[in-house]
Amino acid sequence: MTASRPKALQTFCLLLPLLVWMVDRSLCYKPVIVVHGLFDSSANFKNLLQYINESHPGTNVTVLDLFDNKESLQPLWKQVQGFKEAIYPIMQNAGRDGVHLLCYSQGGLICRGLLQTMPDHNVDTFISLSSPQMGQYGDTDYLRYLFPTYVKSNLYRLCYTQMGQTFSICNFWNDPHHHGIYVNVSDFLAPLNSERPEPNATDWKKNFLRLRKMVLIGGPDDGVITPWESSHFGFYDENETVLEMKYQMVYQDDTFGLRSMDYRGAITVYGVPGVVHTMWHSNQTVFKNCIEKWLT
């Protein structure tokens, strides 16, 4: 019997990796938190949930059911606070392993608000899916529905008022022909970018840089995010010529940590043609090529 023990131990050691894999493959997958966009709800993300469950079985995925549909027009700082209260317990349960944030459209700005204002967040990877990170300036069906008497060139007259800033879309309306007014009036995007003196800027930058990775996804056929390069932190100059991320003041001055993240190789950018705005979270090719590998 004594001689058989080493052989049994050897067999056990050989089988142990297989046993661990069989017990719980999900141990290697971090929780995923999904934040929806304007006029969306958790019901819009059934395909995305299916893709994640098929590729990473057992992953804890939470699609937050807050500020749905018309409620998504609430001011963005109010939404940031609401989502923060819902997300914080998930982060705490994840502990040192951390979580991933997958945030679509307007939700990408809400997630930036979370990342910059939470000193103890444990977000590993932030996936910004067709989100107007540098703002919005363009006529879209959404705008015509919300403000039928206003078009691109005139919307600043409403958005850059105290009343206008009570609408989420006005919180990131960035008119390049009225930049000075935007900087002074914007309640959300301008302070988030530290485009004007912000007392919390140093802390917000430190919080943002807790991220390990940021993935930026967008494309030229989006049809809603205008310019579409805003999803990559590009934006118009005063002549409506798009300047890419590295030529933006927020990058060059590293106002909230964008350049620092880029310098450490922590930003990945995907430009995907042929995808309209409402299909980013339902397109399996986008998931396979741009999202799946980051959810480990």
Swiss-Prot record:
User: What EC number is given for this enzyme?
Assistant: 3.1.2.2
Q: Which residues form the active site?
A: 105, 222, 277
Cellular component, GO, one term = lysosome
From the UniProt annotation, give the residues forming the signal peptide.
1-28
Reactions catalysed, semicolon-separated, are: hexadecanoyl-CoA + H2O = hexadecanoate + CoA + H(+); S-hexadecanoyl-N-acetylcysteamine + H2O = N-acetylcysteamine + hexadecanoate + H(+)
Q: Glycosylation annotated at which residues?
A: 53, 60, 184, 200, 239, 283
The protein's GO terms of the molecular function aspect are: fatty acyl-CoA hydrolase activity; palmitoyl hydrolase activity; palmitoyl-(protein) hydrolase activity; thiolester hydrolase activity
The UniProt record lists the keyword Glycoprotein: yes
Keywords, in A-Z order? Disulfide bond, Glycoprotein, Hydrolase, Lysosome, Signal
Matches recorded under Pfam families: Palm_thioest (PF02089)
- InterPro entries cross-referenced by the UniProt entry: AB_hydrolase_fold
Q: What class of enzyme is it?
A: hydrolase
Q: Where in the cell is it found?
A: Lysosome
Q: List the disulfide bonds.
A: 103-111, 159-170
Instruction: Identify its protein family.
Output: Belongs to the palmitoyl-protein thioesterase family.
Q: What does the UniProt function comment say about this protein?
A: Catalyzes the cleavage of thioester bonds from S-palmitoyl-CoA or S-palmitoyl-N-acetylcysteamine (unbranched structures) but does not have activity against palmitoylcysteine or palmitoylated proteins, branched structures or bulky head groups. Conversely, hydrolyzes both long and short chain fatty acyl-CoA substrate.
* Protein's name in the database: Lysosomal thioesterase PPT2-A
Gene (name only): ppt2-a
